[in-house]
Amino acid sequence: MDYKKKVAAALAPALNEYLTDTEIYEKIEIPKESKMGDYAFPTFTLAKVLRKAPQMIASELVEKIDQDQFEKVEVAGPYINFFLDKTAFGAEVLGTVLSQKAEYGQNDDGNQGNVPIDMSSPNIAKPISMGHLRSTVIGNSLSLIMSKNGYNPIKINHLGDWGTQFGKLITAYKLWGSEEEVKADPINKLLEYYVRFHKEDQEKPELDDIARDWFKKLEDGDEEAMNLWQWFREESLKSFKQIYDKLGITFDSYKGEAFYNDKMDEIVQILEDKGLLKESQGAQVVDLEKYNLNPALIKKTDGATLYITRDLAAALYRYRTYDFNQSLYVVGAEQTNHFKQLKAVLKEMGFDWSDDVHHIPFGLITLNGKKLSTRSGRVVLLDEVLNDAVSLAKKQINDKNPDLANADTVAKEVGVGAVIFHDLKNERTNSFDFNLEDVVRFEGETGPYVQYSRARAESILRKAGDVEEFAQLNITDPKAWDTLKALQDFPNIVKRAAAQYEPSVIAKYALGLAKAFNKYYANSKILADDEEKTARLALVKSVSIVLEESLRLLGVKAPDEM
């Protein structure tokens, strides 16, 4: 149902002497104004070849085109404008959406290729803050979008579960902790112990020595140290999963930093065998000058391996385990240089698949204009933001629809959905400000607006009663045109979102479809008893299907009533 292909096919017999089918297809444009047609073909590039003015070329070409399948084809200066047969177009679009339902837009471009997605990745024993929101929801949406495009996504939560801080945490727990306290409130208690350690070691520097000893024990596999570390990890994960449940997000793997402890020696060995390690001020580095990058630090002067060594081990493990088509890292833009180095070192190691490793960077969130920063003490907990969003949604639902039966469930879907949608409607690399009241509004460019539009469609269908068969799909009302065109575009939008790794493509599309539908609703008598009633209801049903699927691809629920 690619109408651009129909236009290209109509042009091909007259143009194949000069342009390939692909070149014709790529030159076809969608005019900004509908009075200029639904598709337009510019003739500028043919002027050199044919040595004629573009206007003359357009006039001659239009005579050679089979116009039967279009409402009309006309010349406007150097352009040939194509107007689709709106009734036939509408019937085909509605028929396709209604028959395919949630499968509409599904394609097999990915050929079931594996796509590991490194996302979320909070630190054990620390709370999930608003700073973790972006990686978590962008990664989740990308997994849904990649799946819609025929890939097999694997969501990996690469936990921050290793490092010298665990020596400090074990020391603090042994001195001041209790099992009951940790079980009752894992994250807050473990964080409290950690903060206390840093206060006390100002006056008792010997605490640092004890902490170093405990981390050494942990590295050596000491039973008590390992048991405490494992327990801290498990208790933290229980807390994390409560927040992931609220967001409606699951993971395929929680293999974090610790998992790669025994896999880094192989990386160092490969680098040594290939003669890639160079000595620099006592440290071991890989020279990346030919990539215009700083040297990658592999081992410090004391022989300790570094962050990039662990990431190299993880990249190799993922390739061997998943034989991936592409491997994505949804990590903030501030890590761009790190991932450039990672790809370059993998390339130097002789791994051609390094070309399939992609950093998916994103911008920062500010809160009411201020940067979220742990160091300055502005830790804004994600759980609290989600709870506040749900409360705000509940208040608005009570004001709009006080008799709603399942108001608590809907408030959760709207509140949490609002936070996710606000993040994803912004282009990934852009930073944005977060103001909760703006985010949970039912009007404007918000998640609740899209959800409300879809609930409105469901409400119309309930009022119409059971419409099992949409026997008649021909809509002649020009007011339906924008909505029909938006529905037809959904499969292209799904492809574009995957190609650009950009959930905002879906979010902006959903807003556009919702606006087109609401305008149609305001200006049409959908339930009027005439020969086009079933076609209008078919349009409403199609809008409901595609809005629900658009929201699903963002990780947002679509309540039937609001």
From Swiss-Prot:
Molecular function via GO: arginine-tRNA ligase activity; ATP binding
GO cellular component: cytoplasm
Biological processes annotated in GO: arginyl-tRNA aminoacylation
EC number: 6.1.1.19
SUPFAM superfamilies the record matches: Anticodon-binding domain of a subclass of class I aminoacyl-tRNA synthetases, Arginyl-tRNA synthetase (ArgRS), N-terminal 'additional' domain, Nucleotidylyl transferase
Sorted UniProt keywords: Aminoacyl-tRNA synthetase, ATP-binding, Cytoplasm, Ligase, Nucleotide-binding, Protein biosynthesis
'HIGH' region, short sequence motif: residues: 122-132
Key word Electron transport present: no
Catalytic EC class: ligase
Pfam families (alphabetical): Arg_tRNA_synt_N, DALR_1, tRNA-synt_1d
Reactions the enzyme catalyzes: tRNA(Arg) + L-arginine + ATP = L-arginyl-tRNA(Arg) + AMP + diphosphate
Subcellular location field: Cytoplasm
Similarity section: Belongs to the class-I aminoacyl-tRNA synthetase family.
Assembly and interaction partners: Monomer.
Listed name of the protein: Arginine--tRNA ligase
